[in-house]
Amino acid sequence: MIKIPKIGFVSLGCPKNLVDSERIITKLKAEGYDLVDSYDNADMVIVNTCGFLNSAIDESLEVIGEAIAENGKVLVTGCLGNKADLIKEKHPEVLSITGPQDYENLIEAVHTHAPIFANDFVSLVPPQGIKLTPRHYSYLKISEGCNNTCTFCIIPDIRGKLKSRSIDNIMKEAEKLKNAGVKELLVISQDTSAYGVDIKYKSGIWNNKEYQSNIIDLATALGDLDMWTRLHYVYPYPHVDKIVPLMAQGKILPYLDVPLQHSSPEVLKRMKRPAHTQKTLDRINKWRDICPDITIRSTFIVGFPGETEADFEHLLDFAEKAQLDRVGCFKYSEVEGAKANQFDNLISEEVKQQRLDEFMGLQAQISTDKLQRFVGTEQQVIIDAINKDENYAIGRTKYDAPEVDGQVIIGDALERNLKVGEFATVEITESTEYDLIAD
């Protein structure tokens, strides 16, 4: 009897890395490998690493060490794979190291260290591939890499320049996901609004219709699938204005994830971020005029080198004026290889924490005030989880992305016969800082 090699797999980092993991696992399953969820039951372990922040590097190295201790045969891939010397210095026992998207060499290493009898196992793999997210939503990666040169970021060094997929290729994947039961698509990349620039907006045919490989045509085509489609990592370029009418028409979700990072012109200049505070505010107001129920999410960095008290006050003032719906904020931390590491006027950890607390305190109040408008309304939600012991469900409205935004806590889940991955209409009875309560 032929023994099927068992592979343990760990995926670290961002949603983009998760999509890479799905592709690797799909390839392994197609070749007949068995994927297991424990180190000790595996013939070998693959760790798909993150190498962006120093904290992520530390986590990746720690997980590699755990896999070596519990299994002994470990392959490392992903963003930290670009720092092979660091990995080898810390963990010389690692069998193979490959970088992000280096699928061919990774699979070759798998063949070397856990060979499998040649056969055709493609029938074991569903048409949409193997997904690591819950069945009802999926990330849809439309490009790799980035053409921006932000001083706090090393993504272009890790993943290279922008490499867009053709629109017909993306739409074929999106259609497979829909046919597999996916209800929500989360469109991701490093810079979603730059999609297609590198391939000169190459045209493609889908459903007997010609589309250009740009974000407007892509959003239009995805809207025709009649799914929840959510856009992430959208820079506030002028052409984004053309997407918002699609939201007002109900073609795609009224949700924009726009990573602004700061508002102070001086800080943005040092970050090498394209932005102008008043233009950004004007654009936000314009979006709300076109689509009044649009939800705008953003992320910010406090404590960037040289950030003065005046710069921070500028950010607080911007937050008051912008009244953003969903906000994440991080304390600046050095990323090995980033240009910002060379900057003077570093901010102390104590001041960074104070600014983070003050900024998020303000945003918590803004969120509290904005969520109160939902009380007494009926909202469609998608169910993410059900707690049978305590008889409640966790869902999300169209205004909330999974993992990063708020939730709707729904009582009497069993009596309502709520099911994970299905839609339900609920009445909102209460609101908190970030979540809604429904009876």
UniProtKB/Swiss-Prot annotation:
It is an enzyme of class 2 (transferase). Its main location: cytoplasm. Residues 5-115 form the MTTase N-terminal domain. It catalyses: L-aspartate(89)-[ribosomal protein uS12]-hydrogen + (sulfur carrier)-SH + AH2 + 2 S-adenosyl-L-methionine = 3-methylsulfanyl-L-aspartate(89)-[ribosomal protein uS12]-hydrogen + (sulfur carrier)-H + 5'-deoxyadenosine + L-methionine + A + S-adenosyl-L-homocysteine + 2 H(+). [4Fe-4S] cluster 2 binds at C146, C150, C153. [4Fe-4S] cluster 1 binds at C14, C50, C79. The keyword Signal does not apply. PROSITE patterns: MTTASE_N (PS51449), MTTASE_RADICAL (PS01278), RADICAL_SAM (PS51918), TRAM (PS50926). Belongs to the methylthiotransferase family. RimO subfamily. HAMAP family: MTTase_RimO (MF_01865). This is Ribosomal protein uS12 methylthiotransferase RimO. It comes from Francisella tularensis subsp. novicida (strain U112).
